[in-house]
Amino acid sequence: MKRLIILNTAEISIILPTYNESKNIRGILEHIKKSFPSNLKLETIIVDDNSPDNTAKIAEDYFHSIKEKSSHSINVIKRKAKNGLSSAILNGIQESSANTIVVMDSDFSHPPNIIPKLIDAIKQTRCDIAIASRYVNGGSIQGWPIKRKLMSKVATLIAKKGLGVKPHDPMSGFFAFKKNILDGLKFDALGYKMLLEILVKTKGVKIEEVPYTFTDRELGSSKLDTSTIVDYFKSVWKLYKYGRTVEKDESRASVRFLSKAARFFTVGASGLAINYLASMIFSLNSDMWYIHATTFGIIFSISSNFLLNKYWTFEDRDFSPKRTII
């Protein structure tokens, strides 16, 4: 991976993952530059996956043409292979010098004039994540056929219902966030929806949505293909499993107030109580002989002891059949 490194501490870092964007890259960089005051320390990080159309070279040439008269720096990261959008974004985050980061596409589907609105949302509302949203009041999509819109709606519904995320547009690829909210988190970098993974893995963050009009690209070709769709479902499944694991860990942590020995004793005592109560209930409320009632009481106490020991006393053990069958 080769880089054009510009040493600079920026106020805002903008990450542009690219692949074969030679027709758009210079124009998008010019529009980004025009969207901010000339004295603002702005850093654009281009993460290029070895584009054969010289996208990275065009970006480098553009930077050399403006660096003497602008505080806008451009860092071009050249990767040796096409490793995916999410991993490109993570590369960009690692190389960024600002705490406020913007992620966007370079094909003009994400209008650069919306970037200041995202930054304002973070500064004025003190939110942690500002999402450019197609699905809030004032947002829309232009240039997509009905089939593509339907696919987007279904993907959004799956993310919201399946993963429990709250924003209207969790599938947006255009968003800003405070870099420090990612501290301590590990990412799978699978697929192309980095925002979705951030939403699932960050807790207690404040989110704002900014409406915008998504416009389908005019130049270059779309990156959506079958592998992208497959990666999406893979990432949703992995995030779902991640969420379930976190829920289990939190549930277990909430009852970790007794040692294993104390829990085992407590479960045993509760079994005696359940045995006694069940025996009394069966004998007093039916014509059942006391021996039969006691037998049912024993069955209830054995069952309760088994379940309590499995899910509480030994909650850190895996009792799945493949682990328990010898």
Labelled PLM ranges:
Residues 1-9, 160, 187-272, 276, ...:
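Hydrophobic helical membrane-anchoring modules
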Residues 11-13, 43, 197:
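Cell-envelope/extracellular polymer assembly enzymes that use nucleotide-activated donors
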Residues 23-27, 53-62:
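Acidic helix N-cap motif at the loop->helix transition within catalytic regions
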Residues 31-41:
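Short, acidic, metal-binding catalytic loop of nucleotide-sugar glycosyltransferases
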Residues 77-95, 112-192, 217-227:
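Acceptor/aglycone-binding surface of glycosyltransferases and processive sugar-polymer synthases
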Residues 101:
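Short aromatic/hydrophobic "clamp" motif used to bind/position activated sugar donors
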